[in-house]
Structure formats: structure tokens, C-alpha cells
Amino acid sequence: MIFVIRPPVSGNGRDTMTVDANDETRDQQLPLPPRPVLPDMAAARSRGPADVVEAHWQSLRLSWQWRHAVHKIRSPGRPYPGIVPLLDAAAAQPRLRRLYPLTSHFALLFSSSTGYPWSVQAGSIEPLYNGRFKVRRRSPYAVIGEVETAEEAVALVLELLPTGPEAVITASADDHV
């Protein structure tokens, strides 16, 4: 059995290679970076919602950094949405850092609740494959803008946060069990 594999075009004129399915090297995989050691979420829950928020920020950043590193090994040259620089830029902002971060389909959202049902604050930021970032307002739902950098996107979301007293972080029902 013969398979044709089409790796990303390297520019040297070779855009396909043929691999024999019986070749012993077909089962060899490229070495991947070790999985990160994530924070102990159960211990964080026992200390309260603020610790859950901090542990989840750390967990998200480590997890997405690892996924990005794996992507670079498995799919060299293919674009990867800018979720890692987005998480770094958002984590650098104290007003966002105190909210529970969550991701869905690469989009970053911020909740004042540490569990479902989420209480999403402000809006969301979606890293695009072209390297830009799309910012959406939550209510009423609307695209606020598309910007070049993660820092610009974070600045737009900060403008969407309510003024006045900071949102109170609440634990999910599961955290009280």
C-alpha cells in the first residue's frame, strides 16, 4: 500500500513525498515536549475562588504553550492562532487577571464565576489565522474591531469592562461541595 503525504511546500520544488506503508519508520513519531505540570485545581478550590482564578490562568497559559509547541513540531510552517501571546497580554492586566479566563475555539473570554454557568464580563477576543485579533462585545453582541496585536485587543476588552466596583468572583456550585 502506498500513501502520498503532502507536507507544507518548502519552496525547494518538492511538495509531495511517497511513503511505503510497510516502511518500519512510519510508526516513529517526532519527539514532543513533555506535558506541563499543571496547578492542583482541587487544592486551589479548597483555598477559595481567587486561588481558583489564579490556578486556572496558570493552567491555561501552560496548556496553550504546550499545544503551540506541539503544533510547531507536527505542522511546521502552518499558522497557529495567537492564543499564547493573547493569554500573556491579558494576564498582564490586573483587571482581567482577577477574572476567570476561559477559552472556546481559541477565543478568550472572562467570567466572574469560576464555573458553569459562566458570567461573562465585557467581551471576547478571537485570535485569527492571519495574526490579527477580533474583539466582540458580549451584550449587545457586536464586533468591536479587528486589531494587529494582542495588546491592542486586550485594551479594547478593558474598555468594555464595567466601570465602578470590580466584579465579585464567585465560586461555582461544584466548588462548594
Predicted segments with their positions:
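N-terminal amphipathic/basic-hydrophobic helices that include classical n-h-c signal peptides
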Residues: M1-D15
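Membrane-targeting and insertion segments and their boundary/processing signals
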Residues: S124-P127, A171, D175
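Short aromatic-glycine-(Arg/Gly/Cys) micro-motifs in beta-strand/loop hairpins
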Residues: F3, P7, G115-Y141
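Structured catalytic/translocation cores of nucleotide/phosphate-coupled proteins
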Residues: F3, A21, L99, Y129-R132, ...
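General N-terminal targeting signals
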Residues: R74, I125-P127, E152, L161
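Aromatic/pi-system hotspot detector in well-structured domains
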Residues: A90, G123, V147
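Negatively charged, low-complexity tracts enriched in Asp/Glu with abundant Ser/Thr
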Residues: V4-P7, D20-D23, D27-G115, D174-V177
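Ampiphathic alpha-helical segments that act as solvent-exposed interaction surfaces
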Residues: G11-P31, R136-D174
